[in-house]
């Protein structure tokens, strides 16, 4: 499969990569990180001193817990072997990050590629699964109220086409994790909504009525199933398909059938399944989808749900949408209506503020002919504000929608719930501030629009049609809170 590559210098260059490495691990992104290091002769090794070479740091030891493989190369003749080994680990099985630490003298060495040792990978094998596939087929045939949870593992397995064919054939209703949201277009009759605390009430309620849960490439996280997983879908048998045996063995939900396989292979074994969901259950699922109610209506400033509605209408058919974290990601995934070939992704599991700005740059550079939309908050954009200069100087045509609610709403919600509304560093009255974004755009030579009320929504189209980069600030009321669906039992933080 494809692999991303990031290169950093020694010391702080390596440590600055750590948040990205963690995100790549938790979202299963195959990535090779190459980090510089002081010369081998300057490494402190087993010496008891703090540091020997300037900016020396044991980056391998730091990232071991959040990589699939990390090593330091001190012999230049091992470069090919270690590179091939790292790429293999990054791309095989459950994808993830790997890191290679290269001392300066190894970087400078002259090598003969033809004489270097090669890495010969062993083929990955999974437990014999014929019986598991047969049992899966039997459980599906016996079910009356089946429900699929679509996770990120569908796309990781390259199984979007097979997944859609399976859903079209069986007509089983589908609910989604954030990472699986773009595996089925919003207008598909089996598309119900997002499962969990930050999803849709109808999707949650339907899961409680299901008699069979088929989880495809998803994890049963607390945000999805609540603090008491036994009460999630308590009437249902559960089939979980995951390439990672650890998720099957030690996941939070008790499984009736654990299938270690990638989703594409699993669906291939079910291609001869003759099954179609009954009309009564499909009608129930359709009613569940219709239960999603946005906070509609004109407000003093902008209702973010209405904004995302309008943005959905204006986006091109092959747009890539990258929301950041906090309120803007919740309102985006809850309200966006994805079309057939649109993509949405973020750092779903690690969720660092500021992610969507540099991620949008990478998405645009990798897909120059596609419309790339960054949705970010006034707090998040300040984490990576310097990237506006990179965007400007390289004319990277990202369309940035900055949802400005004058604070950290997710933190405010926690302070409301746990601290009696005693805000600290989370709003304009208690230590938080942000710059004048119009002046900031002028300084970076980036065009600027302002959507101050819903009457300004025509500027969404103007923003999307602008050649090159542009930032559109959207004024959100300070006290606006995203809609959280009826929670699963025991979902207290």
Residue locations for each model-derived region?
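Long, charged amphipathic helices and adjacent flexible linkers at domain junctions
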Residues: 114-133, 278-302
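A short, conserved beta-to-alpha structural element at the edge of catalytic cores
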Residues: 38, 350, 395-419
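Catalytic phosphate/nucleotide-handling subdomain of diverse soluble enzymes
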Residues: 355, 359-399, 403
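Active-site diphosphate/adenylate-binding microenvironment
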Residues: 286-369
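N-terminal alpha/beta PP-like core and its mobile active-site loop of ThDP/TPP-dependent enzymes
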Residues: 1-274, 314-317, 397-400
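Glycine/aspartate-rich loop-and-adjacent alpha/beta segment that forms the canonical ThDP
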Residues: 106-129, 224, 229, 454-493
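Acidic, Ser/Thr-rich peripheral helices and adjacent loops at domain boundaries
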Residues: 414-433
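Active-site nucleophile and cofactor-binding loops and adjacent substrate-binding regions
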Residues: 6-13, 74-75, 324-325, 343-357, ...
């Amino acid at each position: 499969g494809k692999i991303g590559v990031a290169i950093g210098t020694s010391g702080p260059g390596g440590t600055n990569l750590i948040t990205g490495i963690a995100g790549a691990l938790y979202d299963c992104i195959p990535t090779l990180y190459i980090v510089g290091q002081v010369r081998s002769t300057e490494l402190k090794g087993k010496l008891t001193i703090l540091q020997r070479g300037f900016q020396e740091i044991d980056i391998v030891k730091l990232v071991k817990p959040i990589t699939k493989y990390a090593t330091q190369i001190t012999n230049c003749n091992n470069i090919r072997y270690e590179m091939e080994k790292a790429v293999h680990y990054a791309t095989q099985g459950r994808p993830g990050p790997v890191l290679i630490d290269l001392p300066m003298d190894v970087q400078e060495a002259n090598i003969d590629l033809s004489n270097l040792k090669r890495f010969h990978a062993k083929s990955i094998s999974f437990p014999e699964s014929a019986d598991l596939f047969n049992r899966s087929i039997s459980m599906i045939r016996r079910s009356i109220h089946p429900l699929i949870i679509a996770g990120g593992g569908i796309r990781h397995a390259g199984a979007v086409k097979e997944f859609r064919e399976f859903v079209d054939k069986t007509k089983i209703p589908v609910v989604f994790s954030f990472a699986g949201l773009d595996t089925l277009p919003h207008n598909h009759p089996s598309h119900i909504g997002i499962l969990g605390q930050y999803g849709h009430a109808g999707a949650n309620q339907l899961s409680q009525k299901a008699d069979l849960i088929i989880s495809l490439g998803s994890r049963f996280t607390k945000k999805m199933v609540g603090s008491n997983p036994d009460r999630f879908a308590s009437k249902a048998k559960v089939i979980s398909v995951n390439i990672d045996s650890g998720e099957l063995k030690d996941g939070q939900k008790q499984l009736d059938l654990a299938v270690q396989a990638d989703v594409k292979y699993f669906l291939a074994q079910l291609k001869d399944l003759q099954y179609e969901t009954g009309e009564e259950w499909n009608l129930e699922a359709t009613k569940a989808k219709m239960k999603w109610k946005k906070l509609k209506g004109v407000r003093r400033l902008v209702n973010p749900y209405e904004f995302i509605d309008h943005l959905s209408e204006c986006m091109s058919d092959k747009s890539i949408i990258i929301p950041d974290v906090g309120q803007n990601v919740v309102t985006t995934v809850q309200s966006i209506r994805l079309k057939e070939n649109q993509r949405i992704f973020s750092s779903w599991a690690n969720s660092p503020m500021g992610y969507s700005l540099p991620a949008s740059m990478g998405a645009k550079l990798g897909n120059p002919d596609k419309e790339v939309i960054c949705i970010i908050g006034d707090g998040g954009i300040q984490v990576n504000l310097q990237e506006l200069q990179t965007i400007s100087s390289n004319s990277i045509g990202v369309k940035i929608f900055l949802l400005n609610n004058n604070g950290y709403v997710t933190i405010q919600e926690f302070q409301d719930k746990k601290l009696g509304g005693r805000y600290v560093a989370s709003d304009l009255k208690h230590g938080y501030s942000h710059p004048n974004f119009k002046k900031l755009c002028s300084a970076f030579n980036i065009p600027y629009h302002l959507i101050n009320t819903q009457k300004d929504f025509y500027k969404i189209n103007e923003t999307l049609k602008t050649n090159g980069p542009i930032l559109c600030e959207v004024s959100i009321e300070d006290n606006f809170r995203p809609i959280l669906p009826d929670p699963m039992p025991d979902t207290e933080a």
